[in-house]
Amino acid sequence: MNWKRFIQFSGVPPSQASLALGMIGLGQAWDLYLPFYGDLIRPYLAGIGALLLLPVLLKYTTNFRTFISDLRHPVSGSLMAPISMSLLMLCDYLAAVSPIIAYPIWFAALLLHLSMMTLFFTFQLSNFKMSHILPSWFLYPVGLISSSLAGTQFGYTVFSSTLVNTCIAIYFFMLPVVLYRLVFEGALSVRAKPTLAIMAAPINLSLASYLVNFPNPDPILTGALAGIAVTMTLFIYLCYFRLLRLQFKPSIAAITFPSVISSVAMYRLTDFFDEYHPHWHWLHKFGFLELTISTGLVIWVSIGFIKMYWPQLGQKS
């Protein structure tokens, strides 16, 4: 194996952070649905996610010019959001294991996310074109909600609940804008097409975070979020039939974490229904189906990345 390919950070695609986010989230999903197995594999998936994220972090910390250049691009820049989101999700796990380690990482990741969001939208608005808008643009303003998961464990309940409400409001504002772009501003480029899968990520992340941070959730808002979440999840499943036919590119990693987040949100929703509407418990089976699909997607994309770094593995001797 040519291990130099893995340590040449300048060539690491930023979308590798999307796979890292999918790995970390998958550990949480398994821990929710099958705690016996989840407790065993979650630390390993979190570790693999951290290892996937590390080269991306090193790429940008060692070359600030590349960081700014990628952040200016409407596709690459938006797909850099999972870098900080992965750290925030990792802190959700670490907060229960080692709060002393988790807190400084959480605070640094929160500052990183806010900084990247400010720079990204400043660059995009200075050269704004409606055709540049992508589903991945949701990730900065709505993805910030992922900081509320560890924030609640650190005792910042007011911060977390306020952030959840704010991010949900931003989502409802951005949704018609993104849909307008997808309908009336032409087809997405081949590189940007995998971002269609991200349509399911912000709403499911909002639903999961809302149910975690509010002990007495509003049934109307919960129903609205759940309805859109299920619709968007089914939409991206239809998209998979086309996206999985595309030639493998690193940006295809964007299909992993939305499906993972959808399974987590469905578990939170069925947990809520168990208490208030037990006749909806059958949705738990749908959530388990989502977990199965997301696990398969993470494995498939992981194999693609392995072949990308070590192409000789796929060659016949």
Residue spans for each PLM region:
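Structural signature of hydrophobic alpha-helical transmembrane segments
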Residues: 40-54, 99-114, 158-173, 219-231, ...
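Hydrophobic, membrane-facing alpha-helical anchors
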Residues: 1-6, 51-66, 109-125, 145, ...
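N-terminal signal-anchor module of multipass membrane proteins
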Residues: 1-57
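Generic multipass alpha-helical transmembrane bundles of integral membrane proteins
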Residues: 108, 137-238
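Membrane helical hairpin/interfacial module
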Residues: 35-101
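A generic transmembrane alpha-helix motif of multi-pass inner-membrane proteins
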Residues: 58, 267-307
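Juxtamembrane helix-loop boundaries in multi-pass membrane proteins
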Residues: 2-27, 64-89, 106, 122-149, ...
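Helix-coil boundary and interhelical linker segments in multi-pass alpha-helical membrane proteins
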Residues: 28-40, 92-103, 149-161, 210-221, ...
